[in-house]
Amino acid sequence: MSEIGSYHDTIFALSSGRLPSGVAVIRISGPKTRFVYETICQAIPEPRHAALLTFRSRNGDAIDRGLTLFFPAPHTFTGEDCAEFHLHGGKAVVEKMLAVLGELPGCRIAEAGEFTRRAFANGKMDLTIAEGLADLIAAETEGQRRLAMQVASGNQRKLYSEWRQRLINARAFIEAELDFADESDVPGSVSMQVWQQLSALKHEIEYHIASGKRAAMLRDGLHVVIVGAPNAGKSSLLNFLAGRDVAIISEEAGTTRDLLEVKLDLGGIPVYVTDTAGLRETDSLVEKIGIERARARMAEADLVLSLEDMSGPVSVTVEKIEAETWLIGTKADLGGSASGLWKYHISTMTGSGLEQLLDALQAFAEAKIGQIEDAVPTRQRHINLLRATIEEIEKAIEGDDLPLELRAENMRLASQFLGRITGDVDVEEILDVIFSQFCIGK
């Protein structure tokens, strides 16, 4: 990413989807935006009004004719002069327009996330809002979209700014007691009240972190692993859940050697379902590796579906794991004398029990996620800094034998950690990581 702070260049990029398309949108931002208009359109449109103009190269050749909008600074997404050119979405048209823009002095193609990074640098958004926009663009389910919108709407920033202000106010009381202890207009010994306020804030942050676990599940998805002996019907179940033939189905035992994963959208919640190698004793080195991977994936699962053929000898065994495990009896169409041993009975041949199992999976996912609050930490970066904030608050509260100056310093550090979440203080080292998650043109 280019050096942040100066932004002498004017950047441009294709912001719409893959070509060819009905319409292609090219965005521009920077100090040369008006010059671009004068060169390519020979006119600057009325601000915020669509104008139908011909776009020309520097030698006067017409590139295309389309709509364009001019947005003068500072009331724009980036805070700079901005423009949009709406062209026909042919590959040759767009490539020619981009080439012409690249030939103009002071103009260059934007890097990934550079429009949003400029918006951050110019005070148009904080880091949590930028991260929310990245999540919104990446959202694939309704639940992920809602969560991303909550963050992008600024709810996190409001909460963290309020907490930071409470820390600053508390620290001001302590420093007032230090500096003006002999003055009559300073309340006597405000320290006790401050520690009580900090204790309440600490509990709020702890609760907030706990709610972040559910948000992380919604953002990253829940993981369901299908296990069982060879030919228990694992691959058939995966194919049903996926709605297509993902796994090879064969009478030959041990067909599945590696992990096969599909992504489901269950009520707006992303759920990753993994088919694994059949669990059994084997001399095959390749199959052994597959079984080891299956056991490793089980250890990371939120839910394990343990399948057993109901038509064969009953030998229900479940490996000891922390994840919740459901016993699923398969091949129900072939009968079975011990059906009460299993939580669900299914048949991929007749479809019996499959919709019931799918409904149960959705109910499990919804219960696991629960009700997401308006402001939750959605990134591990947030949680790490919140934990660091709590640690400094605890030092301040519990430091009875320490000078007030040191406890005030703990409070300063706590407010600084909160400021790092929103980008108000000392975040240069993480900017490249955050904004590289955006596509070019955003």
Swiss-Prot record:
Give Gene Ontology CC terms. Answer: cytoplasm
> Is the keyword Metal-binding assigned to this protein?
yes
Q: Does the keyword Magnesium apply?
A: yes
Location within or outside the cell: Cytoplasm
- Domain of life the protein comes from: Bacteria
Q: Which PROSITE patterns is this protein grouped with?
A: G_TRME
Biological process (GO) annotations held by this record are: tRNA methylation; tRNA wobble uridine modification
**Pfam families xref list:** MMR_HSR1, MnmE_helical, TrmE_N
Q: Which residues bind (6S)-5-formyl-5,6,7,8-tetrahydrofolate?
A: R27, E84, K124, K442
- Cite a single GO MF annotation: GTPase activity
Listed binding positions for GTP are 231-236, 250-256, 275-278
Described function: Exhibits a very high intrinsic GTPase hydrolysis rate. Involved in the addition of a carboxymethylaminomethyl (cmnm) group at the wobble position (U34) of certain tRNAs, forming tRNA-cmnm(5)s(2)U34.
Subunit details: Homodimer. Heterotetramer of two MnmE and two MnmG subunits.
Put simply, this protein is called tRNA modification GTPase MnmE
**In the UniProt record, what gene is named as encoding this protein?**
mnmE
